[in-house]
Amino acid sequence: MKKVVIFFICYLIINSCVSPISKSDDYKKIAEYSWDNEVLSYVAKIHECKGRQELYLKQRPAELERLVEIAKIQSTESSNRIEGIITTNARLKQLVEDKTTPRNRDEMEILGYRNVLNLIHENYAYIPVEPGYILQLHRDLLKYTNLTYRGHFKTTPNEIDMTLPSGERHVLFRPLEPYETPGAVEALCCTYQDVLHRELVDPLLLIPCFILDFLCIHPFNDGNGRMSRLLTLLMLYQNGYVVGQYISIEKAIAETKDEYYAALAQADQHWHEEENDPTPFIKYMLAVICSCYQDFEQRVDLVGGGQKRVTAYERVRSYAMERLGAFTKQEAAEACPGFGTSSIESALKKLTEEGVLERIGAGRKTQYVRR
C-alpha cells in the first residue's frame, strides 16, 4: 500500500493506530522546521484574532446571530458553486431556511450541504476526525440524491483533470486507487489525531496539511471538494477557530478560486513520492483564514461596537469607501448587518444624491460604484 503523509509529520504512529507511515525522522522536521516570515506572520495574526474572538462572542452574542445566518447561506452557495452546483438566489435562501424542498439534483446536493454544515456548526465537539464519521458526513451530504455510493469510499479510480481549449482532456493529478483508499484515510486520521494530541505542531499548520492529503487521496466518487471544505470547518472549530460560523470561509475560497487551484497544483507535486512541499497550500489557507478574521472584526464593529450607535448611512458610506469596484444593494446589506433593507436603500440613495456613489444599471442589475 502506498504511504500517505502529512508533510513533515510522518513518524511512527502510537500502538493504538496501525499505519503504513514509517518515516520517524519527519517528526523531528516538523518540530524543528523554520517557517518563513509570511507563515509566521499569518499564524501570529490569527492567534491574536482568536484571542479577541472570545471577547466579541461574550459581549454581543445576540447581535452576531445575523452574521451566522448570512454565513450559512454564503457557505452553502459558494462551496457548491465551486463544483458547478447552482440554483437561483431565491431558491437558495428558501432551501437554507428549510422553506422548500429540492426540485432537481443540484438542489438535492445543496440541501445536503446545508444539513451537514448545520450539523458541524451545532455538534463539532462530538464529531471525531475518523474514517467512520467522515463516511457518515459524506452519506448526509448526498442524502437527498439516489447515488448508491453515498457514505462509501470510491469503488472506481478517479482523476483530477481539465479540458484544454482544443477539447483535449489533460490529467492534472492521479489520486490513490480505490483499494488503497480505506487504509490511507485511516492512516491520515490517525496521524492527525496523534500529532494534535501530542501538540507537536500548531493546528493552523496541521489542518491545511490534512486537507491537502485528503484531496490527494480523493477518497470519494463525488463530493471530495465539498467534503474537504466541511472538514476544514470541523477541524478549525474543534481547535477554537470559529470564524467560519460568522464569515463564510467557503465564500473566501470561491472568490480566490484560481489561487486555490494554483496552490493545490504546486503542493501536490511529487505527493506520491512523499516529496511534495505543502507550503503553498498552507500559505493560501492561512491567508483565507486571516482575511475572514479581519472581515469578522469589521462586521462585529458594525453590529454593536463602540459607544456611539452607528447609523445605516455611516455604515454604508464606510463600506462604500473601502470597497473596490462596483457592488449591489444585497452586497451592501450583507456587509452591514443589523440594518433593514429600507435603511440600506435610503443610505445608498442619499450617497448617490451627494455624489459619493454613482448608480449603474437599473432594476435587479443595479450596482453602485464610488466616484
Predicted stretch roles:
Residues 2-371:
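FIC/Doc superfamily catalytic core
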